[in-house]
């Protein structure tokens, strides 16, 4: 019984710890989900910008092949292409970074759900142990009541045996008294019979 109570107490403490962690992660997960939405929107926006830059780069590169363009125009367009290429590369890096952060956030969200599952399992185990403990308490009370009834019956039997022993001792005493009286009466009769014979 004490072991069950101790195990139940430990599980309650562990369940409370899991619950606290779950509440913390739940709040953090809520923030992460909001961040995920914002990052997904940023990724979409950056992807659109990236596509626009690529389209502009293609147009500029196509313009370079036009023989009618002056050399100065070509130089300017090449510089624009380089600048746009750098921006495009920066956008791609930012998109990759946001995607990595998004993946990490989703993993944390999954961990939060896993923690909730663990918390539910502990709650079920805790409930089962409480039911087992309640059942054990009921059985213990029933056993204690039966033992009490047995003790009462034993006391009654002991008193009955003691009373019977007293009755037996009383009958033995009376029997001894009757035996003595019988012997005395027999002796007296023998003496009377002897006196009659002498007459």
From Swiss-Prot:
Pfam families listed in its UniProt record: Tropomyosin
InterPro entries to which the protein is assigned, alphabetical: Tropomyosin
Compositionally biased region (Basic and acidic residues): 68-80, 102-114, 136-147
Any one GO BP annotation for this protein: mitotic cytokinesis
Top-level division of the source organism's lineage: Eukaryota
Positions of post-translational Phosphoserine modification: 195
Residue ranges, compositional bias (Polar residues): 115-126
UniProt-annotated stretches for the region Disordered: 59-81, 102-147
Coiled-coil zones: 1-199
GO CC aspect terms: actin filament; actin filament bundle; actomyosin contractile ring; cellular bud neck contractile ring
Coiled coil is among the record's keywords: yes
Gene3D superfamilies cross-referenced by the UniProt entry: 1.20.5.340
Crosslink (Glycyl lysine isopeptide (Lys-Gly) (interchain with G-Cter in ubiquitin)) position: 39, 59, 187
Transferase recorded as keyword: no
GO molecular function: actin filament binding; actin lateral binding
Assigned keywords, A-Z: Coiled coil, Cytoplasm, Cytoskeleton, Isopeptide bond, Phosphoprotein, Repeat, Ubl conjugation
Subcellular location: Cytoplasm, Cytoskeleton
Subunit structure: Homodimer.
PANTHER family (alphabetical): TROPOMYOSIN (PTHR19269)
The record's note on its domains: The molecule is in a coiled coil structure that is formed by 2 polypeptide chains. The sequence exhibits a prominent seven-residues periodicity.
Misc. remarks from the entry: Present with 3060 molecules/cell in log phase SD medium.
Protein name: Tropomyosin-1
Organism: Saccharomyces cerevisiae (strain ATCC 204508 / S288c)
Classification of source organism: Eukaryota, Fungi, Dikarya, Ascomycota, Saccharomycotina
Gene this chain is encoded by: TPM1
